[in-house]
């Protein structure tokens, strides 16, 4: 397990040090999640408050785009990522914008936060980049750091995705990426039963969607993700 964690850290450090994965704008599904369940922007300085959310954690934050997004709205934002390089990017960005964001290097299976210390957690493209058992342990940690009734947003690659089955199979529905900037990293594709196993007993689903994009010159390649908004039990 320790070796796998070390390999993942090295892999993601390489991705970020070479300039990949440095997104500078929030994912649209997270914007919609915020607007529907946290706060909806009405004017340049006025919001409709949906739920009493003050502290938000970006789980697997990368260079910090979602933590920055929440901090810009006046929320107390934190971000954690396995990559030291990504966290350096994130800290520099927050400093440049004059925002206070608690960015840390850390492991999603052992979150360095007190119980019930967040009102919301968001996780974009993270729990599908680890084996299923790791994703389950991370979900347990998310539930621990969320207050009862706290919000958890999560999106996951689906077994209907066009890249399903590509690469060496490391475990059921889990494959090692064979080429590109994520070469050597793990990609898990979630079946319906696996999404159920991730949330059952921990979270109540508020809404769920499948987002799909058709790619390629003939639009036959289907990029498919599950999108879940849940609340902690």
Regions found by a protein language model. Name each.
Residues 128-130:
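A short His-aromatic
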Residues 1-54, 62-110, 134, 151-233:
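Class I (Rossmann-like) S-adenosyl-L-methionine-dependent methyltransferase catalytic domain
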Residues 58:
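Class I SAM-dependent methyltransferase core
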Residues 109-120:
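A short acidic, Gly/Pro-enriched loop at the edge of an enzyme's catalytic core
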């Amino acid at each position: 397990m320790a070796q796998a964690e070390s390999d993942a850290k090295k892999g993601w450090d390489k991705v970020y040090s070479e300039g990949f994965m440095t997104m500078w704008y929030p994912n649209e599904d997270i914007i919609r999640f915020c607007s529907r369940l946290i706060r909806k922007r009405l004017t340049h300085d006025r919001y409709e408050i949906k739920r009493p959310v003050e502290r938000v954690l970006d789980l697997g934050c990368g260079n910090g785009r979602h933590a920055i997004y929440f901090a810009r709205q006046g929320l107390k934002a934190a971000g954690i990522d396995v990559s030291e390089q990504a966290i350096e990017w994130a800290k520099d960005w927050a400093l440049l914008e004059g925002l206070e964001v608690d960015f840390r290097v850390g492991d999603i299976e052992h979150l360095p936060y007190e119980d019930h210390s967040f009102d919301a957690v968001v996780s974009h493209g993270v729990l599908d980049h680890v084996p299923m058992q790791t994703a389950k342990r991370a979900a347990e940690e998310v539930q621990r750091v969320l207050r009862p009734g706290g919000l958890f947003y999560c999106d996951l690659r689906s077994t209907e995705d066009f890249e399903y089955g590509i690469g060496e199979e490391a475990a059921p529905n889990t494959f090692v990426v064979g080429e590109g900037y994520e070469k050597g990293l793990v990609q898990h594709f979630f079946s319906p039963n696996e999404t159920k196993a991730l949330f059952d007993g921990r979270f109540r689903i508020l809404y769920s969607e499948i987002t799909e994009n058709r790619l390629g010159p003939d639009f036959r390649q289907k990029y498919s993700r599950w999108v879940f908004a849940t609340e902690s039990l």
